[in-house]
Every structure is written in C-alpha cells, then in structure tokens.
A protein has these predicted regions:
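An extended, acidic
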Residues: 1-115
C-alpha cells in the first residue's frame, strides 16, 4: 500500500501522535510519503496513484475541491473520529475502499480528542 500524509500542529482541539500511526502502518508494509501538497495527494487517491491519504491541521482551501473529486471517484472519506463529514473538520482520512478499514484503524490509534 502506498499512502501520503500531511501534518500541522497549530491550534488543534485534539492530540495526534503520528509515530503511533507509523508504527502500525509498518506492520501492514505501508510506504508513506509526504508531498507537501494536500490537494494533489487527494487527487492522487482519486486517480488510484495512492491507496490512501490522511492529514490533520488541514485548511479548507487545501482539501475542498479534492474531496469532491475523491468522492466522485469512489474513495471513502472520514475524519479521524470516523465521521464522514470532513468539510467541518481539519483532520481526514481518504482511501480506496480496499484499504480504508486498515488505514483508518492505524490513524485513529494516534488520535485523542481534548474535548
């Protein structure tokens, strides 16, 4: 599986520990890359060039158009809590249906809400 990620740690209402996610992904032999461009990573998921993407601290303008394209292409999308409405959340998981369950499990392992 090939996945991508993006992180920002400013002004968040949750704690995310990416190292826990990386350790679990290693057990699934997942290759993780960081392009630095959220919108491109989302579109790569839609095109089948990536199996998944997850990120937190994401800005709406970085993800909005890509989310629509990914949904239209059949990707599954949720926030780190499992809620499918990612338009109101700055953290999200996008993946092909085949990889979504495993990727979500790994990402959620490092997520804790402060609320």
């Amino acid at each position: 599986m090939l996945s991508s990620t993006g992180h920002s740690n400013k002004d968040q209402k949750y704690i995310y520990k990416p190292l826990e996610t990386y350790i679990l992904l290693n057990e699934f032999d997942v290759t993780v890359r960081r392009s630095g461009c959220t919108s491109l990573d989302i579109v790569y998921c839609a095109a089948g060039k990536l199996d998944g993407f997850w990120g937190h601290g994401l800005k709406l303008w970085d993800r909005l158009a890509g989310l629509h394209i990914a949904q239209s292409a059949g990707c599954l999308i949720s926030d780190f809590k499992g809620v499918p409405d990612t338009y109101s959340s700055d953290h999200m998981i996008i993946s092909t249906p085949k990889c979504f369950k495993d990727l979500s499990k790994c990402v959620r392992a490092g997520f804790q809400s402060k609320e």
